[in-house]
Amino acid sequence: MPDEVILTPHPGEMSRLTRLPINEIQSDPLQIARFYSNKWKKVVVLKDAHTVIASPSGDVFINDVANPALASAGTGDVLGGIIGGLVAQSVPLLSAAVLGVYIHSRSASNVSKNVGVSGLLASDLLSEIPVVMEKLRNS
């Protein structure tokens, strides 16, 4: 695996990567993300209601903007695209992960105000992402 990698598993994927039971991952996602980020020497974005972002240096961030709409199919791919786009603009990996998770969750919150959390499609996020990014640039 290349050195410059951001992993973005949800608990089920993290279970397959680590061979830990899903309930163990969900019971302490902060410590699990921190441990495996250090072990693998990779940035880990452990997606769940409160997404945990961990770096190999031990820094850990928690996104407290929980949105059940992000549990729908394809939203993780949108997150990967946001993070990848930031990395392509030379944003450092950890910063790209933290910022990407924030942009993703804020976009979902904004969209779900109009369509609700149960009707959100991953593609609904696409028009809101540049709006959130522009607000960040201007703040």
Segments (PLM) and residue ranges:
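Charged C-terminal helix
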Residues: 108-139
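Glycine-rich phosphate/dinucleotide-binding loop and adjoining beta-alpha-beta core of small-molecule
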Residues: 1-65, 138
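Short beta-alpha connecting loops at secondary-structure transitions
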Residues: 17-18, 64-70, 80, 84, ...
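Short, well-structured alpha-helical segments that form the helix of a local strand-helix-strand
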Residues: 29-37, 93-107, 122-130
